Amino acid sequence: MAGVGGGNDFQWCFSQVKGAIDEDVAEADIISTVEFNCSGELLATGDKGGRVVIFQREQENKSRPHSRGEYNVYSTFQSHEPEFDYLKSLEIEEKINKIRWLPQQNAANFLLSTNDKTIKLWKISERDKRVEGYNLKDDDGRLRDPFRITSLRVPILKPMDLMVEASPRRIFANAHTYHINSISVNSDHQTYLSADDLRVNLWHLEITDRSFNIVDIKPANMEELTEVITAAEFHPHHCHMFVYSSSKGTIRLCDMRDAALCDRHSKFFEEPEDPSSRSFFSEIISSISDVKFSHSGRYMMTRDYLSVKVWDLNMESRPVETYQVHEYLRSKLCSLYENDCIFDKFECCWNGSDSSIMTGSYNNFFRMFDRNTRRDITLEASRESSKPRATLKPRKVCTGGKRKKDEINVDSLDFNKKILHTAWHPTDNIIAVAATNNLYIFQDKVN
C-alpha cells in the first residue's frame, strides 16, 4: 500500500533510530519534544531530564546515496535544572516542555526552550579557529611575566577541531504562575508568546524583565473556573494574529490590533456537540491537546483525544475535515480513564505542502492522513522494523471477531508505548517520531 505524504505515491522506510535499547528506561531519558528548524538541517529534541540534543543532517555523497535522511549528533547541552519554589513549596521539574527555533539570520542558530516556569534563549554556534600569540599570556592561558616581554606580538588565528557551543543568551522567568504549555515565535522574528493554563504572555526577544499579558482567563473566584488554555500559536504570516485552544474543545482567534488585552476574541471556533453521543467522558476527550497553523496560514489543525480536525479560518461553525485517529478506543474510555491515559496530550504536525498531516497513537503507532485523497495509514515505530531502508508495513487494529494475520487486536495494544511527539521536515518527506526514549527517523522510498 502506498504511503501518505503529498503528491506521488511512495512508501515510508526506516532511516535511523537514536537512543538506548534498554527495557528499563530512566524517566529522565524520555523525549518530551521534537522540532525541526526552519531549513530542516537541524533537528532538536528535549527530554524529561532537561537536556536538549541537536542533530544535524548529513550531506549526501555518492558513496552513500541513501544518507540524505540521516541525522547525527551536533550538540548536546543541559538546558534546565530542577528547581524549588520556596514561596509555594513546589518542585519545578527540569523537563523540556517545548522547543522552538528562531529563523536563522547569520551563521549561528537560536532556539527557545522552556520547562514549566522558565524560558531560555540559546545560541548554537561553531568554532573552528582559536587565537594564538597573545602578548600578556601564554598559549595555555597563563599570564606572562611582564618583565620578560621583550617584543610585541600580533595575535593570529590558528585552525582547530570544530567545536559546537551552546550558550544561554537570555533567560525569561517569573512571568507564569501556572505551568507553561506553549511557546510560539512570531513572524516578525522579534517577539514570541508563552502560554500557561490561564494566561498568554507576549515577550520581546531582547527584553527579559517584563512581558505583556495578552490573554487572562483567570476568574475572580477560582471556583468559577470552567476551562483552561491548552495550547497557543502565532499565525505564520500575520504578526498580529494568534490562536489559543481550551480544555472545552474551543479555539479562539485573537487580533492584537483590536485591544492590548485580547480577552475578547475575533473568531470563535467550536463544533456543535451531538447530544445523542454525550457521555461522562465527552468533555475530557474534547479537550484540545495541540493546535497548529498550516504553512499557508489558511487552515489550522487541532488534536483532541480521538481525532484530528482541520479548520478553515473563514468558517467558525465546524471543521472542514475530521480524521479519526483511534476510534476503536471509544469503547475503552472507562479503562483509559482509570489508568490516566485519557489525559495524554498528543501533538500533530503538517507536511511541508499542507497536503498531509501526522499524529501519534498507542502501541508506538502513528497515523498519517492525505487531505487530497482522504487515504490514511497506520505505521509503527519499532526496533523490529529498524533495518536500514526497510519498508514500513501498514498496521491495522481489529476490534473483535476473527483477527487477520497482520492485524492486532485492540485488547493487545500497549498503552505504555505511545507516540506523543512527531515532527515533519519543512520541505522533504522526512519525519521524526519520539517513542519513549528513542527517536525514530523515517524517509520516503520513491517507487
From Swiss-Prot:
Subcellular location: Cytoplasm
A molecular-function term among this protein's GO annotations: protein phosphatase regulator activity
Any one biological process term the GO annotation gives: cell division
WD repeat locations: 26-65, 91-132, 175-213, 224-264, 283-321, 338-379, 414-447
SUPFAM superfamilies assigned to the protein according to its UniProt record, in alphabetical order: WD40 repeat-like
Annotated Gene Ontology cellular component terms: cytosol; nucleoplasm; protein phosphatase type 2A complex
Main location class: cytoplasm
Record-linked InterPro entries: PP2A_PR55 (IPR000009), PP2A_PR55_CS (IPR018067), WD40/YVTN_repeat-like_dom_sf (IPR015943), WD40_repeat_dom_sf (IPR036322), WD40_rpt (IPR001680)
Keywords of this entry: Cell cycle, Cell division, Cytoplasm, Mitosis, Repeat, WD repeat
Cross-referenced Gene3D superfamilies: YVTN repeat-like/Quinoprotein amine dehydrogenase
Note: ppp2r2d is an abundant subunit in egg extracts and represents 70% or more of B55 subunits.
Function comment: Substrate-recognition subunit of protein phosphatase 2A (PP2A) that plays a key role in cell cycle by controlling mitosis entry and exit. The activity of PP2A complexes containing ppp2r2d (PR55-delta) fluctuate during the cell cycle: the activity is high in interphase and low in mitosis. During mitosis, activity of PP2A is inhibited via interaction with phosphorylated ensa and arpp19 inhibitors. PP2A complexes containing ppp2r2d (PR55-delta) also regulate the activity of TGF-beta/Activin/Nodal signaling by restricting receptor activity.
PANTHER family attached to this UniProt entry: PROTEIN PHOSPHATASE PP2A REGULATORY SUBUNIT B
Family: Belongs to the phosphatase 2A regulatory subunit B family.
Record protein name field: Serine/threonine-protein phosphatase 2A 55 kDa regulatory subunit B delta isoform
